[in-house]
Amino acid sequence: MNNKTLKYFSVILIIFLFGCSKSIEKSPNIVFILTDDLAYADLSSYGSEFIETPNLDKMAEEGVKMTSYYAAQAVCSASRAAILTGCYPNRLGISGAFGPKSKRGINPDELLLSEMLKENNYKTGIFGKWHLGDAEKFLPTNHGFDEFYGILFSNDMWKFHPERPEGYPDDLMLYLSLIHISEPTR
């Protein structure tokens, strides 16, 4: 092979190698907000004329706005289990809402979205209501969440209402979630 042909093939090889290489993209940030007792058109971004939700509207405008979706069940524990596992609640054996000191909770053998995110080097946190069991083996920090601050089920929130010296639990949950979001990835 002569020198000219070698140069020609070298240039073609370099173009081919660099042209075919895929640039490494940064993983997207994921912020998932789940609200209780919210109907389809309760947010102004979905048509409500009664409730103003400017911050959620802005998030919907800049992110993903879902218009066709299905709630697996209309109760807390079952719905949360479905969202975190991708399974029907009945397949998980969850058909209602867990109460305080329940012997039941999310099966430790189920693979949760939080665990899949951890496997892909995401920093995970949950701030608010868990409602998937309050025994140690059911806690969110044992299911792929790095941080948790909130309530374990619904029935415990009323004893804190209306006042606590350190403020409303919702305000503290919001504050801690904002700190979590703003911290750099580990």
Q: Language-model segments: which ranges?
A:
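Formylglycine-dependent sulfatase
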Residues: N2-K4, Y8-S10, C20-S182
